[in-house]
């Protein structure tokens, strides 16, 4: 009985190790343009593709947060964003956000509702922003297919000389019938174009001058 228990525990540990190795190392680079590297991998226990974009910007943490928090202007720089608005401000660091995505005819446009939370490590000053779907927060909107699965995160890591490493991850099921070419846009072209625009927009005077009260900069 004891031998069987030990064997079972060992198998469980081995499975966990293999799973951890996959989730940390199984990325494939898809794009590397304008200083932005875009990777994908198959999500655990799913056929969906998870995306990771990594790039570097010389700017303050406040400027980045000011841009990310400026939801009303997402249509100006987020790829194919039609509308973006805050539905509920829970606190300085938590909110519920609604956004639409415009897709080519004859496909139906998509929309989603997400709850977003921000935290900052007191020692390293690393900022983590996590978003997950809240599809039932408001009723479905006519003309849009509501996305039921969306998980996203930003990790902002301050480095030397004012450089910030930005890592963005996205796992999304666009819902409904999606052709392969659109799926490719979702996981590669769309995020790449968004991050190219991000690097330009964060340098605008409006964001460069921003001082976000709850964000601590590196000394």
Predicted regions mapped to residue ranges:
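Eukaryotic helix-grip
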Residues: 21-219
